[in-house]
């Protein structure tokens, strides 16, 4: 038998930042995190307050903003805390909780991007039937179903990880408890964990990405049948924001998991993890607000109504 130690805590390696630059990066990450919180909260509030945004697209967008807000909050507070103190430990239960919520909100973003792509497909290819196909009841049920799927999927992987045994090495080579890193630390058999990750990754990453590509292929095909400058402009104005977010989200995932790793794979994994846990959630509100007339008009209406009330 191997000598096994009951692990009560893990040590997060953190980001490879020189000591003299810690304060600078702490301030940078704090500003990025606060920007993420405020930007996504603004979208959620606007969608709730402005009746003209009570549409399927903005239902999905508000849930995406909530998911982004929580996704960043899973890792950033602990990272900021560790940068201000010498104690980088995280309790065993806290590590599993971080892994669970990281998967919940990461999966939810992937699902919501598919739902938003389908919404754009119906709006452009079947405009006369849009309200009947994308009914409020259907969209609400779809969002609830997606939350149930993501929480169940995350719970399955978390429970499988909880059954693993860990030996003396408890240093997590990342700034948060990533499931892949935890499996490398386990000294018990991880075959079931790896098998389920492979199966579920196919279902939750590859298939959603394929569905998004298919939706936009149908949109492009529909536009090409009746080519016009107005039609092309409509597609870009309607889908540009969503395509930008899809590119950011899946671009980082492809860069992290599909590109070959070099000698500095740990640093690369941390950088890519920062991209999709911090940078992408921060940029999403700017992408949707700067390229979306409805959001700009809604913001003006809400501000004007507040002035009238005051």
Swiss-Prot record:
Tissue-level expression: Olfactory epithelium.
GO BP term (any one): signal transduction
Extracellular-side segments: 1-23, 78-98, 157-194, 259-270
Keywords: Cell membrane, Disulfide bond, G-protein coupled receptor, Glycoprotein, Membrane, Olfaction, Receptor, Sensory transduction, Transducer, Transmembrane, Transmembrane helix
Transmembrane segments: 24-48, 56-77, 99-118, 138-156, 195-217, 235-258, 271-290
GO CC, alphabetical: plasma membrane
Ranges per topology, Cytoplasmic: 49-55, 119-137, 218-234, 291-310
Disulfide bonds: 95-187
UniProt-recorded Gene Ontology molecular function terms: G protein-coupled receptor activity; olfactory receptor activity
Sites where a glycan is attached: 3
Superkingdom, taxonomy of origin: Eukaryota
CDD domains referenced in this protein's UniProt entry, alphabetically: 7tmA_OR1_7-like (cd15918)
SUPFAM superfamilies according to UniProt: Family A G protein-coupled receptor-like (SSF81321)
Membrane topology of the entry: Multi-pass membrane protein
Subcellular localization: Cell membrane
Protein's UniProt keywords contain Metal-binding: no
Family: Belongs to the G-protein coupled receptor 1 family.
Function according to Swiss-Prot or TrEMBL: Odorant receptor.
PANTHER family according to UniProt: OLFACTORY RECEPTOR
Name of this protein: Olfactory receptor 1496
Species for this entry: Rattus norvegicus
Classification of source organism: Eukaryota, Metazoa, Chordata, Craniata, Vertebrata
